[in-house]
Amino acid sequence: MRGVRGVRAGALLVGLALAAAACGGGNDNGTGTGSGGNGNGGGSGSAGGGGSTETKKVGVVYDIGGRGDQSFNDSAAAGLEAAKKELGSKLEVKELEPNADGSNRKELMDSLADDGYGLIIGVGFLFSEDIAKSAKESTDTTFAVVDGFDTLCTQPNSNLICLGFKEQEGSFLVGAAAALKTKTNTVGFVGGLEGDLIKKFQAGYEAGVKYEAGQKGKKIKVLVDYAGNTPEAFRNPAKGKELALKQIGQGADVIYHASGGTGAGVIAACASKSKYAIGVDSDQSLTASPAERKWILTSMLKRVDNAVHQTIKSYVDGTAKGGVQTFGLKEGGIDYAQNQYNKQLLGDIPTTLDQLKQQIAGGEIKVPDKPQA
């Protein structure tokens, strides 16, 4: 069974192929790059890729901003690069990015399915509903969505995988770091789109601040602001800078952002006022300018790269399974950043954070995933 889309598209394939040859190439309906071999690599009816030696075709559709966002998309891209390095000629890869308003996400995924890409990864929760529809239409294709809604991935033997993270656990760690670093006993949190996902970051951060403040016998205030209620809230550095400057004016000397590209403004604001920023998703010290880098205390590492890498690898070796897959501290999906740039800033803070990691992974500390009253 080729699936609804495969049947619908099948009658057109010969004509389209001839037309594409005459025109000198196809149309991605978005920004795209391709690499790798030239096999078919279609999956079977379940999530597994079959484990054969043929080249497997893997498509990745980034969210708006694509590669170069120094955050979420770049972390996914790093996972793809790791998979390409490990699997080499076993992979043929194509990368796409939606248009400015994201309205063609499903169109891009469907085009990859029609072109025989056996695994298609959508980067970000905004893909969730579209990718669920595509999975129902293209039953021979395996789909995976980073931060996908769990309610869409209830069938463990389906062709849809939701890759989830315990963001609250890593946010707890950087919250503890903020509590240990603050001199004003006021810290800040700047979120992107206000919703359940980013509330997990807020919840963990507030819990970490509160826990470590309690250990030190202090009371620390957490200021909270969100950049908006639309996807634009993840790509508005000017708004991020405005909110961070407001919090600094209210006494915050450490600010954690969970706001994608908007966070560039948060980091810039902190650096301009000699206050500390905490990055998110990837190690933002590694991509920041030298002037800003020295004010990035750490970053909450959401190992999207590991999740993407593992998903591609399991697809290629035929062990991928549909359903929800969750990555926390215990699974290597969450951490905090330590590097040559922030070693001096952190001082002995890692000693405390590493102890907390063990306590969280072992279940001794339960981190809330919703803000507490």
Predicted regions and their residues:
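C-terminal motif of bacterial Sec signal peptides marking the signal peptidase cleavage site
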Residues: 19-22
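Bacterial signal peptide processing site
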Residues: 24-27
